[in-house]
Amino acid sequence: MIFVLDVGNTNTVLGVYDGDELKYHWRIETSRAKTEDEYGMTIKALLNHVGLQFSDIRGMIISSVVPPIMFALERMCLKYFHIKPLIVGPGIKTGLDIKYENPREVGADRIVNAVAGIHLYGSPLIIVDFGTATTYCYINEHKQYMGGAIAPGIMISTEALFARAAKLPRIEIARPDDIVGKNTVSAMQAGILYGYVGQVEGIVSRMKAKSKVPPKVIATGGLAPLIASESSVIDVVDPFLTLTGLKLLYEKNTEKKG
């Protein structure tokens, strides 16, 4: 079995693959303060809950946009799994033709999503990932990663509104009853939700205009289903796009080793 870790700024998503099947997946908080032992015990409890042991895992791969956490995670893999994990970064084979001015600036999560997106859906392709930041990636009809856009995530914007506006409360991100809010909470929900739907449709439509062939639009991330339910431009919601990409990269980089 292969253990994959997608480390985001807010949450870390973990998955166990048995062949091509994602057997188990979990979401835990990303904490820069945790030690390798704390991460090890957290993961041990998750594995034990589904009847697995550290020894059931034969390979590991990590994608991270939080560099300070990597020391603890790599130590955890070595100490508890006795495995040196693959790290998505310089030196790993991706098969991507990246047209960024500096390819090293492309986040690991965006690379992993692009690998999975091309494999599953072909090209051209637009990938929208609703994470701590909302990222947009454009892959042209030649399967070249052309770049994209990065915007503040929905939760960041909501928290900023709460923090900077004295009379506005912290709210749940949810669909309001009406676009015209009748109270402060519903008005904020309408502004946040439909403001982001407008952002998605505006950016995606402009990216589509650059393509000679209509690109498929894939959304992933925790709030993708909510945004997709209100948007006309998203074709597919794939909640496990990043985990799929990690599995594919693991296979690409270990195939000669059997």
From Swiss-Prot:
GO MF, any single term: ATP binding
Annotated K(+) binding sites: D129
Catalytic activity, reaction form: (R)-pantothenate + ATP = (R)-4'-phosphopantothenate + ADP + H(+)
Active site location: D109 (proton acceptor)
Entry-linked Gene3D superfamilies: 3.30.420.40
UniProt EC number: 2.7.1.33
Biological role stated in the UniProt entry: Catalyzes the phosphorylation of pantothenate (Pan), the first step in CoA biosynthesis.
SUBUNIT field: Homodimer.
Protein name: Type III pantothenate kinase
Source organism of this protein record: Geobacillus thermodenitrificans (strain NG80-2)
Record lineage: Bacteria, Bacillati, Bacillota, Bacilli, Bacillales
Gene: coaX
